[in-house]
Structures are given as C-alpha cells and as structure tokens.
Amino acid sequence: MKSKYKFLGIIIVGIIVVFILYIALNFRWHLVLKDNKVIEYKAGLVDKNIRNLTIYIPEGTTEIMDDAFSDCKSIEKVYIPESVKIIHRRAFIGCKNLKEINLPESLEKIDRDAFNGCTSLEVIRIPENVEYIGESAFSGCTDLKEISLPQSLKKIKEMTFYGCENLNNIEFPQNITDIEMGAFMGCVNLEVVKLPDTLSHIEGYVFSGCKALREVDLPNNLKYIDDATFNGCTSLSSIYLSDSVEELGYNAFGECTKLSEINIPDSISQVGAYCFEGTEWYKKLPVDSEGLKYYKHILFQATYNMEDVLVPTEITVIAGGAFMGHDELKRVVLSDRLKTIGGYAFSGCSNLYNIAIPETVRYIGSSAFSNCKSLENISIPENITHIYGNTFENCEKFQYIELPQGLEYIGKEAFKGCTLIKNTLIPKNVKQIDDGAFSMCINLENVEFEGEPLYIGNSFYDTKYYNSIKEDEYSCKYIGNHLIELVDKKREKVIIKDGTVSIANKAFSQSKIREIVFSKELKMIGESALGHCYRLEDVEFPDGLIYISKLCLIDCRNLKRVYIPKSVEDVGESILLGSGNVKEVFVSKEIAEKIDFYKNVKVRYID
C-alpha cells in the first residue's frame, strides 16, 4: 500500500517539475536557434500583452529565417549583430509596433516581404553590402519617412515600397538598371524623383498614385515607360522625354491632371491607350476636321464616330484605343508611312470591313482588331514577328489568314472565335503558340506546321482539327511532340511518349493521376498543368527541363515530394500554392529563391 502512494507521489512531483520547467521556459520570450540561424521567436507568457519589447539577436547568428518574427506585435526594437548576412522571407512581416532596427554592415540580402506591414518603422538604413532586396520587402510601411539605398543595388523589385505613405524622398543608387512593377505605388508624399542614367526601363505602376510627386528627372538612356507608370501623379506639371524614349505604355501619364508641359520626341514608336488621358496637355490638343486628335507623328484618338477615315500621311504611330468602339466605322485608309498600330486601336469596330495594313507596319498590339465582326480579310505585313493576345479575336468573317514567314510568336486567343477559318499554315520560324490561339475556330480542320514550335499548348481547343486528334494508349492527345490533354481524368498512371517537349496548360488538371513518367526531352510545363491532382504524391521532373509555369502544382493536397532538376532556368509564380503537405523539395538554390515554400518543407539544394 505504501509503495502505491510512493509511486503516486513520484508522479505528482514529476508533473509539478514539468509544469515549473514549462513556466520557466515560457515565462519570457526566447529564440529558437539552429546552425547559427534564427528559426523562430517564441513570446513568453508575460510578453504577449507588452508592446515595447527589445530583441537582441545573439552574436554569431548568420541568418534570420522565413517568418521568424512574423506578426510579433509586441516587438519595438531589434538589434542584429554584425554576423548576420541574410534576412529571409517574411522574417518581420506584420510587426506593427517595430520602430527601430539596425541592419549590420555584414548584411547581403533582404528577401521578399521581410518587413512588409511594419507600420511603425520610420527610418531604415540599408548597408552598402546589400545587393538584393526582394519583392514587397517594405510594402505597407506606412510610417517610413527615410530610407537609404546602397550603391551595390542593381534592381528595385516589384512592390518594394508600395504604400509607404510617408516616404517623401529617396536617393537612387547610380547603378540601378531596373525598377519593377509598383515599386513606389501609393507613396503619396513622395515629391521628387531623380533617376540615374543606367536605367533604361521603368515598369508599370512604379509611381502610380504618387499624388505629391511634382518633379521627375528621367534618365537620358530611358527607352520604355510602361503601363500606368505615373498614373494619378496629380502634382506633376511638366515632364521631359529624351530622344531615347521609344515606348509609352497604357495610361502611362493618365490622370496627371496638372501635366501641361511635355515634349514628344520623334523617337517614340509605340503609345498605349489613354497615355495622357485627363492631362491639361492632352485636353488642349486640337482636333482636325476629321475629328482626329494627333500631335506630330502620333494619332492619339478619333473623336468622331464616322464611316470613313483617312489617316494623315505624317502619322507613323496609331495609339492604343484610337478608334476603339467606333461601331459606325466602315472604311479606313492608313498612312503608307505607318509603323505601329497600338493595342485595342480598332477593337469593337463591328462594321469595319475595309482596311489595308501597309507593309511598313512592324508592330500590331494586343486586341488591335478584336471584335471587328465585319472584317473579311486582312493582310498581315511581312515585318510582323509577333501576333499578340486577342489581336483578331472574334473576327467572325475571316475565311483565311496568311501568316507572315518571319512570324515567331502567336499570342493567347489571337484568332479565337474566327469561326469561318478552315485552314492555316504555321510558318517555320514560329517558336511559341499560346493557349487558345485558335480556340473556338469551330470550322478549322486542317493545320500544317512548317517547323517545330517549342510550345503549342491548348491552341486549337474546340476546333474540328482538335477533335480529330486521336488519343494514345494512356488517353493523351498530342500535336506533334506536344502533350495537350489527358482526356480520361480517371487514369492513374501516364507514361509520356518519347520526344515530348511541352505539356499544355491544365493538361492533367483535376485528374486522378498518381504517377507520371516524363519524357527525357521535356523542356516546358504549362500553367496549372498538374493542378488539383489530389492523388499525386511524388513528382520528379526530368533533367533537361527548362521552364515550369505558374501554379503548375497548385492544390495538390497529398503531394509529399518534388524534384526540380538543376537544368530549370526559371519558374512562374506560386507553383506550390495550396500544396501544403509537401515535405521535401529538391531544387537548386537559385530556383528555390523564386518559390514560396510552406513552413514545414525541407528544401534540399542540389549541385
């Protein structure tokens, strides 16, 4: 009996000891460290309601890992030792009370979303050794007023400073070559921007919504200003474009309501729709007797909805959307000096039936003739190398289309819904035909290829030609050496035939596939190609694969292991989105940096 009570007493004492240890370990915050890396911050029991914690990261630490301090709202200050080289993805994301952090001179890399949503951070100095700052690294830092960028920085990634509402000044490094999409979008107090001459391209939305921006110094070597780059910069009154500028994107300066002074150099060869819409300068442009609003060599807009239009001979550029929606327009005579037709230029001109594109034209933008339902035939100039997305979509009266011999690319849904086309010849130089390029051309029955494109995808879906393709023994449809569809979605195993170089978008999507044996020649895998394959557990892509498109393995809920060979040069966004049970990924370090992994994934780098 005594031994029984003695045993019970030991158990009780053991429980008390464990409880005391738990309290001791969790009373105050502590860091989880492994191999000189901060893996995780654990808040103590008394820390959870405190708002002014100071964190000291120990000497010798080399990296702060993904999500290490994510959403730690109690932290106000962080001191990082000189040994730290990398701050990984989302390391301090959502630390809303973080006001002060020192970045050591040893630091080389700040990864994507590292300080996203740190709304109390006011000043930050980035050391000179930092060569990489990832996407959205400081996005949503609404109190950030000052930031110094190192001269070592070459690129400012997309959305890096998006929504930094109090940022009023920034000095750009003299070696910057690229500013990516939306980098300073919504920085409503940014007043002056002086860009270095090393910059040749400003991507879309970079300064969109910067309402206080009053002065912009553009680089002398700038060639491209992309879509909506300065849209909504309502304090900007003048802009100088050098002779190097060639392209202005959609809405590039749209709604810059005070913009009244701008020079248009002769070098400009492409102009997107609504480029200067809402500006004082554009409002003052005169309209000629034909209702055409143009300046120098650029036709911006046809303001009258007329049956016949004669484009002036001096016009070499028709801006995007110039005649869009003109349902009265029937006949257009283009200038024989014309070089470019912008996107959506004649989109929705439902009664247009007569237009001859001169051989001088080198560029036709996306959707340029979409929904021109009366247009019977059109001759595409031999200078055209790219036919972009939706260019001739729903041109229902097209009976035949002759593609130029120099053509290299046919975009997504370029000829979708051209229901009368029966035959087409794909020239030998075509390298890529994007998905839906000829979809819903219901009478298309004969397609000939002079060459061997690298990617075809679901280009011919819902055509007689597509329906005539026979399935192989594994229920797969092929066009040449391209796998375009797994027809029987209940099939559990597929061996892809030798020589196959591409797999189309969604080819295996929502199937019950468990095992895929890829061809050794495979080079490209399309968007969502293996998406929603709930029974798939292991994927080993073949050596020699070059590109994996975005969302390739989306929502493969039971996927455990993925092997991505070192031959892969690039991957699209979110290839593992929703595949939260992946335990192990073999991949090169370079490609791993482009993939968002869930926290429980073991990433094993391959040489």
What residue ranges belong to the model's regions?
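N-terminal Sec-pathway targeting helices
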Residues: 1-16
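A structural signal for leucine-rich repeat
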Residues: 576-577, 596-598
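Consensus positions within tandem repeat domains that build extended binding/scaffold surfaces
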Residues: 45, 65-68, 88-93, 111-116, ...
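Hydrophobic residues embedded in beta-strands of well-ordered beta-sheets
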Residues: 38-39, 299, 483
